[in-house]
């Protein structure tokens, strides 16, 4: 029989264990590093901020991993903040406004740095459900369907 080992941990899931998202984040990175070392397939949810996602993608690519990126986009900072407020109201974790603003303003630069390591990427608009609006293959970003949200047009300009 075939078996699959899956490493899974969110910094937010670690709160009951560690009582601290920072410690949970460190544990998540340790597990990601272990999966990479062991050649285990993995997935990571990330804001793409900081240098770690790019460094991880580069190392994974060098180790022979096939890299897929799934990006969910929103048009405005206020949409992002509103979603965080809704999550907090339902008992989820909060993110400081200044962190959201900083990450939001750099999001396309972060994607542009990561795309060279991706074998494929799919971009979804999340204005009203998930709608596939573009795909990245063979080094090219290709619109899909008729929907062209403002953020997608910004992304296209950012990666030219």
Residue ranges and their predicted role:
Residues 44-45, 69-73, 124:
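Small/polar loops that bind or transfer phosphate-bearing groups
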Residues 57-60, 83-86, 136-138:
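Short, glycine/charged-enriched secondary-structure capping and boundary segments
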Residues 65-113:
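A glycine- and Lys/Arg-enriched "phosphate-lid" helix/loop adjacent to the NTP-binding pocket
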């Amino acid at each position: 029989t075939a078996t699959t080992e899956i490493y899974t941990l969110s910094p937010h899931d670690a709160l009951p264990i560690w009582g601290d998202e920072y410690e949970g984040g460190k544990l998540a990175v340790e597990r990601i590093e272990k999966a990479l070392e062991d050649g285990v397939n993995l997935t990571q949810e990330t804001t793409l901020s900081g240098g770690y996602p790019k460094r991880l993608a580069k190392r994974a690519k060098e180790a022979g991993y096939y890299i897929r990126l799934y990006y969910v986009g929103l048009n405005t900072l206020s949409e992002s903040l509103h979603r965080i407020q809704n999550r907090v109201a339902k008992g989820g974790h909060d993110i400081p406004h200044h962190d959201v603003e900083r990450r939001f303003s750099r999001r396309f630069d972060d994607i542009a740095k990561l795309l060279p390591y991706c074998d494929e990427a799919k971009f979804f608009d999340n204005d009203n459900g998930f709608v596939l609006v573009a795909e990245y293959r063979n080094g090219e970003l290709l619109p899909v369907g008729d929907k062209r949200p403002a953020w997608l047009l910004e992304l296209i300009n950012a990666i030219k």
